[in-house]
């Protein structure tokens, strides 16, 4: 098995459960409870928790890669900006997905620019809090 495949499998086993759990909860809340129509503000904690989950996932990927020396010998100082940057990328991709759902299917997912920016902020805040917790725990 190639080292890259082993890394991918280890990363998925180690930490993919967190974003998958958040996504499944999100879908169940929509289908089962029509949650965002009933409580539009439910979107705010979901983006925060999503940021925590995706930072956890990228942190697990980073650690699995470091363990296999796929990143060389990364300095510990690189962990926070790399994970926060990847969390930011995931939040932006999610917002693009919401935009496409609205454009293609007519399902209102982004009421206005302020909502989109708050979603991005909450995702980044969730990621930053997880990174801070992880850093303090490992120090």
What are these regions (language model features)?
Residues 33-43, 92-124, 128:
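Interfacial helix-loop-helix junctions of multi-pass membrane proteins
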Residues 1-60:
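"…centered on the first transmembrane helix and the immediately adjacent amphipathic helix/loop
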Residues 14, 31, 35, 79, ...:
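Generic hydrophobic alpha-helical membrane-segment signal
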Residues 49-66, 103-108, 124-137:
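Membrane-interfacial alpha-helical segments at the cytosolic side of multi-pass membrane proteins
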Residues 22-30, 55-59, 86-98, 123, ...:
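Alpha-helical transmembrane segments of multi-pass membrane proteins
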Residues 16, 21, 71-72, 93:
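Short, flexible segments with low predicted structural confidence
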Residues 66-88:
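Internal alpha-helical transmembrane segments of multi-pass membrane proteins
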